[in-house]
């Protein structure tokens, strides 16, 4: 067996409101609005004795408490998300999930941001 590295991903969803305080007056995102966010979490590593990088339930256990902080909340009130752009939300997740290689945050079907290590 080779020492290969594998990547796995899991998708989550949450709904939140936010506004972007650092955009100019008149910009539509300066106003309070909401999104049905989708996030893709990618984890990488060597396969363990079970043949997993991680069991998906292990990723769920890491992500669930983070989603509880964001779901149906005003993101601007969450520490680290005072200016909650999609890029900053992705970074917020990346910094809090062990072994995470990348996080992609979708604000809608057409717009996303990705942050990686």
Which residue stretches match the model-derived regions?
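Charge-rich, low-complexity N-terminal segments
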Residues: 1-117
């Amino acid at each position: 067996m080779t020492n290969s590295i594998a990547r796995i991903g899991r998708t989550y969803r949450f709904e939140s409101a936010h506004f972007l305080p650092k955009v100019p007056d008149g910009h539509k995102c300066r106003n309070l609005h909401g999104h049905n966010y989708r996030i893709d979490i990618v984890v990488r590593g060597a396969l363990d004795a079970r043949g997993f990088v991680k069991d998906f339930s292990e990723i769920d256990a890491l992500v669930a408490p983070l989603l509880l902080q964001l779901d149906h909340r005003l993101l601007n009130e969450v520490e680290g998300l005072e200016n909650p752009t999609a890029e900053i939300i992705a970074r917020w997740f990346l910094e809090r999930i062990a072994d995470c290689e990348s996080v992609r945050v979708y604000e809608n079907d057409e717009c996303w941001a990705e942050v990686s290590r």
